[in-house]
Amino acid sequence: MRHQKSGRKFNRTSAHREAMFRNMAASLFKHELIKTTLPKAKELRRVAEPLITIGKVDGVANRRLAFARLRDKEAVGKLFVELGPRYATRPGGYLRILKAGFRAGDNAPMAYVELVDRPVVAEEVSE
């Protein structure tokens, strides 16, 4: 019985899951918008939101903690320089999950994961 066992396994080993969410969180912090399956998006919240909370207070200990969880210098730098100050007054709820239909190959439910309050860049219209 799996009573009180939180988290999804995704038919992966624990190391594979950890690496997958580490990479997804780093990509999310770099690009501020990623597309993935809906269950992975929901599980990514459990990884990314605490990291943004850590990023709100810049310091050596917090940077080392974030680097230990992300293993990506560029993502950690952006987390503390850009994202932490942006969400300094927000008490959680840093991610938005938007459903994005179904994947063509296997009909898996897809979703966009984006950081709330991200600056929207106007796209150029090619003529």
From Swiss-Prot:
NCBIfam families: L17. Keywords: Ribonucleoprotein, Ribosomal protein. GO terms for molecular function: structural constituent of ribosome. The gene is rplQ. The keyword Signal does not apply. This is Large ribosomal subunit protein bL17. Part of the 50S ribosomal subunit. Contacts protein L32. GO terms for biological process: translation. HAMAP family: Ribosomal_bL17 (MF_01368). Belongs to the bacterial ribosomal protein bL17 family. GO terms for cellular component: cytosolic large ribosomal subunit. PROSITE patterns: RIBOSOMAL_L17. It holds the Pfam family Ribosomal_L17.
